């Protein structure tokens, strides 16, 4: 338990290696992961090459403006201002849970737990930044108009229609506690 420090041993049983994954589940999770990785990571060398295009080719009209505003020159919290060219934000996805796929229906959303770290390119070292939970709704628009380059990034017309990120307090490292020094 991360809060009390109590340790326990749990034994998993079952055959987890042969778990069947449907093609639809694999494609949905891959698209969700690609969007979150592109949207939440930052590297000055990749933002214009891949992250920007991937995010905007998958972001719907209600989602794209927030990403554009995040990287706007007028935003004092924009990643380039915070990290510059010498540091990058790396994303590690911990889990993806598809939502709304019960009863043979297609999933319409996902919850993604991920951790971010800041990578110092000069030193080659990473430092934990935070843990987050992204909640999204999505659909597929096969008739979505994309140029050939964007269609290669998003061949099935995956479209994120709603997107929200919150702090994941369950997996966040505990803050340091100060104890009074004995006299």
Where are these regions (language model features)?
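Structured, amphipathic secondary-structure segments that form assembly/contact surfaces
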Residues: 1-26, 30, 40, 46-183
